[in-house]
Swiss-Prot record:
Lineage: Bacteria, Bacillati, Bacillota, Bacillota incertae sedis, Caldicellulosiruptorales
Species of origin: Caldicellulosiruptor bescii (strain ATCC BAA-1888 / DSM 6725 / KCTC 15123 / Z-1320)
Name the UniProt record assigns to this protein: 3-phosphoshikimate 1-carboxyvinyltransferase
Reactions catalysed according to its record: 3-phosphoshikimate + phosphoenolpyruvate = 5-O-(1-carboxyvinyl)-3-phosphoshikimate + phosphate
The protein's Enzyme Commission number: 2.5.1.19
Stored HAMAP family: EPSP_synth
Length: 433
């Protein structure tokens, strides 16, 4: 599906942003491993999260959708051998976290995914999980899906420092450590998103975590998990598109309520504020360890910024939309130390640069990042390739709203990976200036 957007639009409304993708995946996984019935409210029914549900159904977890809630009947880590190949579709989170969980199971399973996921590296999880005693076989190409995994009931605990901060790698190791024979210690610097730790603590697992001298440590003891009730907040990674829309379109403002404000996720707010964005955070509350609150943003004169290396993990999924904001800012923006972008759904350094250039922006690819020279006056409508990457499609759509003329976003249906009603909300909440 291609989407046409008639530009020079503005927004002046409340937007109901979809539920958080990271927390939605984890709610199904932790619910499946818990003893008892987990109730999930406000689950994200997007392609990635549906892939997680299907994998766990295939592992015999009883998952039922009842009046907008999801009911997961957990069997305390007693999963059953899948009858089919586990298809993780486009979802890196599903794959890597599942590899950690399946390391605790004695049966054999095969995981695969779509053509994009089959290009994403998996040794980052299989190497440490093998040290714990799980067995992996790459069935086509070393480091990539499809993978055969055979776990063990006698996993060794691990002491491991992540070479690159990653919530997916950390979470895979935490899940495996819950069933290891002793205490595991995982370290990373700087800290990546900690939803797994927070949700497992809430479910009674024996986990401690702390930060000291810039190093984040998680200590895990063998644990049982209790069932929980979860109400999932809105996803700040999805909210980011509407925040930037309000910032770059004249006479605009947006209000997003009930949004996740976990400090490992709010890098986009901090960097946009450094760029001069008028953003306010209000009504913050703590919901079982997760901060949730309201975001208000309005049109602002932005200036370029150099993004700090330590902020990269806190902003990793928001870099395509941050780059759009940078194209409307005055001066240069430098985003470096972001080599991880090369192994997302697309090579997001290349695809973000291509997308911005189609609109006439001045921007350059760096080895591990990108440089954007703000040039609001030069920007024009475009026909843009999304490279079937949801975050590129949405970032391009926001850019298309702000420039003059009609733009076309190619293969825009990929937004269903994380934000299925993105275009309904975009067209109903904006109007031509
Ligand atoms: O754990 C998660 O839910 C995620 C972790 C991040 O990936 P990495 O762990 O590879 O950095 C992020 O890019 C992804 O969208 C979601
Ligand atoms: C990278 C992403 O997700 P995943 O790694 O789960 O595919 C994303 O949503 O931008």
């Amino acid at each position: 599906m291609n989407v046409k957007i008639d530009g020079r639009r503005k927004i002046n409304s409340n937007v109901i942003v979809p539920p958080d993708k990271s927390i939605s995946h984890r709610s199904i996984m932790i619910g499946s491993l818990a003893n008892g019935v987990t109730e999930i409210e406000n689950f994200l029914f997007s392609d990635d999260c549906l892939a997680t549900i299907n994998c766990f159904k295939n592992l015999s977890t009883d998952i039922e959708i009842r009046n907008d809630k999801i009911i997961v009947k957990g069997n305390g880590f007693a999963l059953s051998a899948p009858k089919q190949i586990l298809d993780c579709q486009n979802s890196g989170t599903t794959t890597r976290l599942l590899l950690g969980i399946l390391s605790t199971q004695e049966f054999e399973s095969i995981l695969t995914g779509d053509s994009s996921l089959k290009k994403r590296p998996m040794k980052r999880v299989t190497v440490p999980l093998s040290q714990m005693g799980a067995e992996f076989e790459f069935l086509e190409k070393e480091d990539f899906l499809p993978i055969k995994v055979k776990g063990s009931k006698k996993l060794k605990p691990i002491e491991y420092t992540l070479p690159i901060p990653s919530a997916q790698v950390k979470s895979a190791l935490i899940f495996a450590s819950l069933k290891a024979e002793g205490k595991s210690v995982i370290k990373e610097s700087p800290k990546s998103r900690d939803h797994t730790e927070l949700m497992l603590k809430h479910a009674g697992a024996n986990i401690k975590s702390w930060e000291k001298d810039g190093v984040y440590t998680v200590e895990i003891l063998p644990s049982q998990i209790s069932s929980i009730k979860i109400k999932i907040p809105s996803d700040i990674s999805s909210a980011a598109f509407f925040i930037v829309l309000a910032l770059i379109c004249e006479g605009s403002s947006v209000v997003i309520e009930n949004c996740i404000l976990n400090p490992t996720r709010t890098g986009i707010i901090d960097v946009l504020k450094q760029m001069g964005a008028e953003i306010k955070i209000e009504d913050v509350e703590n919901r079982n360890g997760e901060l949730v609150g309201k975001i208000v943003a309005r049109s602002s004169n932005l200036r370029g910024v150099k993004v700090e290396k330590n902020d990269i993990p806190r902003i990793i999924d928001e870099i395509p939309i941050l780059a759009v904001a940078a194209a409307f800012a005055e001066g240069k923006t430098i985003i470096d130390h972001a080599s991880e972008l090369r192994v997302k759904e697309s090579d997001r350094i290349k695809t973000t640069v291509e997308m911005l250039k189609s609109f006439g922006a001045e921007c350059y690819e760096l080895e591990n990042g990108l440089e954007i020279i703000g040039s609001r006056e030069k920007l024009k409508s475009a026909v843009v390739n999304s490279y079937k990457d949801h975050r590129i499609a949405m970032a391009a759509s926001i850019m298309a709203c702000a420039v003059e003329g009609e733009s076309t976003i190619l293969d825009a249906d990929c937004v269903s990976i994380s934000f299925p009603n993105f275009y309904d909300i975009l067209f109903s909440s904006t109007k031509k200036i």
